[in-house]
A protein has these predicted regions:
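Pocket-edge positions in alpha/beta enzyme catalytic cores
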Residues: 69, 93, 257, 307-310
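Rossmann-fold NAD(P)H-dependent dehydrogenase/reductase core
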Residues: 4-244, 248, 324-332
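C-terminal helical subdomain
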Residues: 17-22, 200, 248-301, 310-316, ...
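A short, mixed-charge helix-start or loop-turn motif at secondary-structure junctions
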Residues: 189, 193, 251-255, 303-305
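A signal for specific C-terminal beta-sheet/loop modules enriched in small/flexible residues
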Residues: 101, 303, 307-308
Length: 332
C-alpha cells in the first residue's frame, strides 16, 4: 500500500532550543489547556484511558475537542472515560495487530474528514520477551511500528486538517544504549527488556523527527515528548524490588519526590499538541513543557536528549525499515 507523495522537498528541523514556555515541570495538563479552544477539532489518542493518557484526554476534551480513543481494552476504557465530560468516543485498537490498526483508521475516517491532533500515547515498558504474529519484538511492534502504521493510515485526515500536530510519546529511556536496526527484534542477540524499551523510545523520537521533515509541506508538524517519571500502569511488568533498586520508591513504598502526578505527566503532551508558541516549529524533543536541551553525559539523571535521536540519517533509515516491516509506503 502506498500513502502520499514521495517527491516532496524536505527542510531542516527546528532547533533544539528552549522557547521560555510559561509552563514547567509541575504544570498540569489542565493548566496548559486552560486558554486553548479546540471546538470542533478531532483528536485521536491511543491508550487514552490509562495513566497520562487519561489526563491527556481529560484536558483536550475540556478544551472542546472531539476525542477518539484507541483502546485495546474497550470495556475498561469505558469504565474510566464514561464519567468524563465532553465528546469522547472509544474504538477498538490493538497496536500489535495490523488489521486492528487498519480497522481503527477506517472507523475514524467514517466519523471525520480530518484529524487535527494525533497523540501516540499507548506503550508497554520492560516487558518479558514476546512477539507479535509477524515475529516482531513486542515493545518495538507496539510502541513504534503500530503507531507508524496508524499515522500512515490517518495521513490523509491529518493532511486535511490544516495545521495538524502529531505527538509521539518518547521517554528518557531513549538514552538506554542505542537503536540496533540490524537486529531490532532480538533475533541474533539475547533479549534485554530495557534495551528493547530504549530502542522503541528512540524510534518514537526519530519518527517525530522524520515525520515533521516530510509533513511540514502539508502543514503537519510532529513532536517527541518525554513526560517525566510518573507512577502509572506502565510499570506493571516491574516488581517493587526492581523499582526500589532504581530509586523510584523507598523502602516504605513511597514514590520518589521527583515523580510527577499523572496530570503533570500529561502536560507536555498537551503543550506540544496545542501551544501557540510552537507554531511554525516541529521535529523537536520536548520535556517539562518546553523544548529540551542536550543531556549532560556526566549526569545520567539529568534531563535532556542524547544526540542519536537528532540523527537525520538514522531517522531516514528507520522510516524506510518501518515501511518495509509494516508493508506501508508512507511518503507524505
Amino acid at each position: 500500500m502506498h500513502v502520499g507523495n514521495p517527491e516532496k522537498e524536505s527542510r531542516m528541523p527546528s532547533p533544539q532550543t528552549p522557547v521560555n514556555s510559561p509552563f514547567g515541570y509541575r504544570s498540569t495538563a489542565s493548566e496548559v489547556a486552560e486558554q486553548v479552544d479546540l471546538a470542533g477539532r478531532y483528536v485521536v489518542v491511543t491508550g487514552g484511558y490509562s495513566g497520562i493518557g487519561t489526563e491527556t484526554v481529560r484536558a483536550l476534551a475540556g478544551a472542546g475537542a472531539k476525542i477518539i480513543v484507541g483502546a485495546r481494552r474497550e470495556a475498561h476504557a469505558r469504565e474510566v472515560l464514561d464519567p468524563f465530560e465532553g465528546d469522547i468516543a472509544i474504538l477498538p485498537l490493538d497496536l500489535a495487530d495490523p488489521q486492528s490498526i487498519d480497522s481503527f483508521a477506517d472507523s475514524v475516517a467514517e466519523r471525520t474528514a480530518s484529524v487535527g491532533i494525533l497523540v501516540n500515547n499507548a506503550a508497554i515498558m520492560a516487558s518479558p520477551l514476546a512477539r507479535d504474529a509477524r515475529g516482531y519484538e513486542m515493545q518495538f511492534a507496539t510502541n513504534h511500528l503500530g503507531h507508524f502504521q496508524l499515522a500512515a493510515r490517518l495521513w490523509p485526515l491529518l493532511a486535511a486538517a490544516g495545521g495538524a500536530r502529531v505527538v509521539a510519546l518518547s521517554s528518557i529511556g531513549h538514552r538506554l544504549p542505542g537503536l540496533d536496526l540490524d537486529d531490532p527484534h532480538f533475533e541474533r542477540r539475547d533479549y534485554d527488556k530495557w534495551l528493547a524499551y530504549g530502542q522503541a523510545k528512540s524510534a518514537n523520537a526519530l519518527f517525530a523527527l522524520q515525520l515533521d521533515k516530510l509533513g511540514e509541506a502539508h502543514g503537519v508538524r510532529a513532536f517527541a515528548v518525554h513526560p517525566g517519571g510518573i507512577a502509572t500502569p506502565l510499570q506493571r511488568y516491574l516488581t517493587m524490588d526492581e523499582q526500589r533498586a532504581m530509586g523510584w520508591y523507598d523502602e516504605d513504598g513511597n514514590v520518589h519526590e521527583a515523580f510527577k502526578s499523572t496530570e503533570e505527566g500529561a502536560a507536555t503532551s498537551v503543550w506540544c499538541a496545542t501551544s501557540p508558541v510552537l507554531e511554525g516549529m516541529g521535529g523537536v524533543y520536548c520535556e517539562d513543557c518546553d523544548i529540551a536541551v542536550a543531556a549532560d553525559p556526566d549526569n545520567p539523571r539529568s534531563g535532556g536528549y542524547w544526540p542519536h535521536i537528532r540523527d537525520e540519517a538514522l531517522a531516514e533509515r528507520l522510516w524506510a525499515d518501518s515501511e518495509r516491516m509494516v508493508g506501508v509506503e508512507f511518503r507524505p
